[in-house]
Amino acid sequence: MPLELFDTADQEVRLVETPPAGSDTPVGMYVCGITPYDSTHLGHAATYLAFDLIYRILLDNDHDVHYVQNITDVDDPLFERAARDGVDWRDLGTSQINLFRSDMEALSIIPPKDYIGAIESIDEVIEMVKTLLDEGAAYIVEDAEYPDVYASINATDKFGYESNYDAATMAEFFAERGGDPERPGKKNPMDALLWRAAREGEPSWESPFGAGRPGWHIECSAIATNRLGHSFDIQGGGSDLIFPHHEFSAAHAEAAHGVERMAKHYVHAGMISQDGVKMSKSLGNLEFVSRLTAAGHEPGAIRLGVFANHYRGNRDWNAESLATAEQRLATWREAARAATNREDAIAVVEQLRAHLSADLDTPGALAAVDNWAAGIDTTTDSKEFTEVGNIVVAAIDALLGVQL
């Protein structure tokens, strides 16, 4: 069943443009990864769970998927946390990357084909920055001490198309989310950093435009387009990345490669709050995946708790969310042990496909299985799923990533 998703750039739900089903050409999907300085919290997990659903639906539609994810393993938050804890930033990054991968595996999230760190893509970034400089889309600030390289916001005539934000909103988010509008020497306050000239105490790499390290946005531009092509199918992440990160990543790639759009579809997942308050490190109200699984909560219940609300909305997580999900899991298992009506089983599988293909309508998908389960007489002592029950069990595993 063809997949439709909301496109942030076009502000509408529309069909995802893919190569023909069964072809040798994969669907290209790039999702921004973590900065590895803390454990994986539920906000991270919810984003990757949304794109895991997309991956599963594409596989169900007989598509191969080339899934790429980056790791921002050289960045200020990582350095700051390492300094605070008195550890080497490389060791901190490695430990958190390993924990992240372990959490994703625990949640049955299909791993990317390419999992690329910023450090290992330094040469790719340097090449793209050089291209932007050669094309006049970037410049070096006149600063003898720190000759940083910036991308001109005017390098493309479509800047702003991905986020659809007005100038005031862009300026606000640029300042709040890693931008440096007051940096002396910039031609425009909104010009984005491409290459940070070497500073004492910071890692740096040699380049034709001086020693330094990559800016945040250009890392994703280089990693994505070097693996998926200059214009690929799906670019994704959390809604907090819509601007500036995804807007600038697209602008850098489009200016460097001369394409209209870096991605055909821009997809974003909403934020997660805890008991009505946005999860944040500063508030200390993060719900960590590793703690939930260590406490004995099944990964399938965590997935169902997240899927109870639509991926694009900002969602709340609390103890009731998990309790409801665990009860749902138990109810579905009971139904699968007693199911005998093959037509009903086949029908609910098709309903699952239909809901998930309609912009990941997980509430509708879960309700469809609930309705199927409610119609089954579960007075049985059997501990095994019936042959008919296994039809639904297999679909729930393949499409929702939930094992009964």
Curated annotation (Swiss-Prot):
Binding site for Zn(2+): C32, C220, H245
Motif 'KMSKS' region mapped to chain: 278-282
Required cofactor names: Zn(2+)
Gene Ontology biological process: cysteinyl-tRNA aminoacylation; mycothiol biosynthetic process
UniProt catalytic activity: 1D-myo-inositol 2-amino-2-deoxy-alpha-D-glucopyranoside + L-cysteine + ATP = 1D-myo-inositol 2-(L-cysteinylamino)-2-deoxy-alpha-D-glucopyranoside + AMP + diphosphate + H(+)
Cofactor binding comment, as recorded: Binds 1 zinc ion per subunit.
Coiled coil regions in record: none
Keywords assigned: ATP-binding, Ligase, Metal-binding, Nucleotide-binding, Zinc
Domain of life: Bacteria
Positions bound to L-cysteinyl-5'-AMP: C32, G33, I34, T35, T47, N70, I71, T72, W216, G238, S239, D240, I272
Family, per entry: Belongs to the class-I aminoacyl-tRNA synthetase family. MshC subfamily.
Oligomeric and partner information: Monomer.
Name of the protein in its database record: L-cysteine:1D-myo-inositol 2-amino-2-deoxy-alpha-D-glucopyranoside ligase
Gene: mshC
